[in-house]
């Protein structure tokens, strides 16, 4: 076993005698909408966290990681929020068995930087590495390789869950508390607080990707290319132009690839094939006004991006180029201005691919603009009742907040429901309890497991109240 040195928790000024820092903070999700105020507890002391859970007031408690959920699942107006970023140690990495034992507050970026030099890789990554392990479990995140690797929790061997009674339970996918494991998977922190997890890693020869880029002339061409040979690639995603109307609506490109083998690299990269090349260039200042993204600026951006992405094959790319372009810029969400934005993401069955174009037409006709549009194919669903991915197409669009956005999203909700689809809890910030219940028919089964482990409803969030996830 190769042991990584323990990472010390970040220092916290003005901490209490028990090492905990308690503050009152205004919190939002990554979309910077619907701010609420809560008491925030930040500590690496598990006993302090357990006591805070046991003594939580009537507004309850919820855990929060790096705040990358777009909506309100890690907010708790008038209640307690446990900031997990102090609990960020990597306890060990077993290179032989390819297993990492990590705290829930450890980010995927930190974990990757630790394991890549040993020829290991985190098997499922979302669109950013700035997500904690606990958040990855709570949202059951997915990546561009869902069709080959499933969701993040498919690779979780065990997790330690702090429940409402202050006890810590070790859960496994096939253990005696399998139902609680599955309820925690995608359960948005409402079954308890994940403290620690063991993650099964993949083996890689290099830290690079070998990628193919294909231009598509419209939505139909895009879908045809995806269907033709998507299974030949480990990772697959597309970007498309949502501003151009008419016959070229949906033009864009497919970016697909797999982990590069040593033989795929040019000589200069073979000297250090496991170098983790993921720089951060700049931090967005909080100076941008709302409304900068309009039809004119979005059209120019779409035109540039489309023409830049020419068809080519066998391109060697680092993780930033291939997967995490937005991680080049810290706080990039500030680019939408103080009014913020929401990301609308849904999945529909393959046979309802018609909804993809129909939804984009509805957005264009409404006068709203989205410059960041991503389309992917999902593989089969898992057994977790609130896990989002299910077999079909998933579409994600970023929409700046402006007048009429609520009505547009209500329309999209009904279109998604009519097609047998559903929304992603980690992205949602505004749908209704009724619509959510219709999208997730296993919600009653999830509530039964959740209520059994938390009969006093101690775990709660702004999202859980809005969607009536926790009842009684």
Report the location of each language-model feature.
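Noncatalytic alpha-helical scaffold of FAD-dependent oxidoreductases
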Residues: 1-472
